[in-house]
UniProtKB/Swiss-Prot annotation:
The gene is ND2. Core subunit of the mitochondrial membrane respiratory chain NADH dehydrogenase (Complex I) that is believed to belong to the minimal assembly required for catalysis. Complex I functions in the transfer of electrons from NADH to the respiratory chain. The immediate electron acceptor for the enzyme is believed to be ubiquinone. GO terms for molecular function: NADH dehydrogenase (ubiquinone) activity. This is NADH-ubiquinone oxidoreductase chain 2. It comes from the Eukaryota. Its EC number is 7.1.1.2. Coiled coil: none annotated. The keyword Mitochondrion applies. It catalyses: a ubiquinone + NADH + 5 H(+)(in) = a ubiquinol + NAD(+) + 4 H(+)(out). Belongs to the complex I subunit 2 family. Keywords: Electron transport, Membrane, Mitochondrion, Mitochondrion inner membrane, NAD, Respiratory chain, Translocase, Transmembrane, Transmembrane helix, Transport, Ubiquinone. The keyword Transport applies. It is found in: Mitochondrion inner membrane.
Amino acid sequence: CKLMAFSSINHLGWMLLAMMNNELLWMTYFLLYSLLSISIIMMFNNFKLFYFNQIFNISMMNPIIKFLIFLNLLSLGGLPPFLGFLPKWLVIQNLTSMNQLFILTISVCLTLITLYFYLRLSYSIFMLNYQKNTWMLKNIYSMKMSSMSLILNFISIGGLLMILMFYMIL
């Protein structure tokens, strides 16, 4: 999906900011971003969603699966309180402590643009109902999500708990 490519460019910018200031921060960002990306990629692969217009056709999908995709997209976009917000929050704290507010403002604004597209995609998944479904050869209900995909989804959704645990340790 092209959206994943554009999102990767945005995340690359955040990783470069983290890399310039703190090596551990960069590795933390990369690890969490990889976890979230793998979660989304596995879901898209399980349901054979390779193009943007195919995502609109998942109206026939189980509402729980649609909700998981929605939450994972918001997490990947960096919306609080999901796990995807944690690395950005750490970079924000680091840049604020180093008084690099100009670059921080630009990064946050660009992230809001990316988050807008994730919200638009999520809205399309829930609200639009496309009945024409010529690209699928199998019934979407017959496809099962792998246990690994489910585990990754719940980890990315449970970001608030991980953030709280992170601050309790510090």
